[in-house]
């Protein structure tokens, strides 16, 4: 049931760091397509990802073409405020499929040509017209958890597993 978050030319290190932490916590693959708007040594990137970077299944690509060549056979969904379909109306429940959620730059989104070519797989998250967009890391988390919800949360812990006990049995 591999789920994948794909960031096309991300610009803000804290967003990518937050997304990496979500990926580590959900066993979701993270794909970064260059150029990145920051160095992978950036303090903000590392701080947002905390000490979870070793648990992130991370791949880098030099272009969209390279990404698609190396990831054939999955279902690709392009997240854009222009999408004709709401993300929650799609079925992500098949455990034998790879689901790729592709996000664009924080400032400009995904290339128009890519969206036009894949119009039927363009998804949006409903929001008011009071803002231009939702935060990238929040949006990635929404998609990751919707896919996991439909997959009954896969191998994620169904019960709390903490050293500290708050509630009595």
UniProtKB/Swiss-Prot annotation:
Residues the record lists as binding S-adenosyl-L-methionine: 79, 104, 125, 133
Subcellular location: Cytoplasm
EC number: 2.1.1.207
GO molecular function, one term: tRNA (cytidine(34)-2'-O)-methyltransferase activity
Catalyses which reaction(s): cytidine(34) in tRNA + S-adenosyl-L-methionine = 2'-O-methylcytidine(34) in tRNA + S-adenosyl-L-homocysteine + H(+); 5-carboxymethylaminomethyluridine(34) in tRNA(Leu) + S-adenosyl-L-methionine = 5-carboxymethylaminomethyl-2'-O-methyluridine(34) in tRNA(Leu) + S-adenosyl-L-homocysteine + H(+)
The protein's role, per its UniProt record: Could methylate the ribose at the nucleotide 34 wobble position in tRNA.
Protein name: Putative tRNA (cytidine(34)-2'-O)-methyltransferase
